[in-house]
């Protein structure tokens, strides 16, 4: 199943990006990752890819794979960024 999901080639990535993500999410992911220190970006990219692949592999219906994987990985990233910068929003 994962064989069908090809990683986004480095030449098509926006700077330091996760290995797997939906191309339509690239500007949003790039903007969120841009708020992080460079030392933390690689770790967050790996976590995003892991979240994306976990849901991709678990979803039995092929037409739902990208949608569910996007939702899960993007939600995790949004919550992480929100918690990380919550102290500045008070």
Region locations from a protein language model:
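C-terminal alpha-helical interaction appendages
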Residues: 2-90
């Amino acid at each position: 199943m994962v064989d069908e999901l090809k990683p986004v080639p480095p030449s098509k990535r926006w700077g330091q990006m996760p290995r797997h993500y939906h191309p339509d999410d690239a500007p949003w992911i790039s903007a969120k990752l841009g708020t992080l220190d460079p030392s933390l970006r690689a770790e967050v990219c790996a976590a995003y890819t892991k979240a994306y692949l976990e849901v991709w592999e678990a979803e039995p219906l092929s037409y739902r794979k990208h949608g569910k994987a996007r939702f899960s990985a993007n939600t995790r990233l949004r919550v992480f960024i929100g918690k990380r910068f919550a102290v500045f929003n008070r």
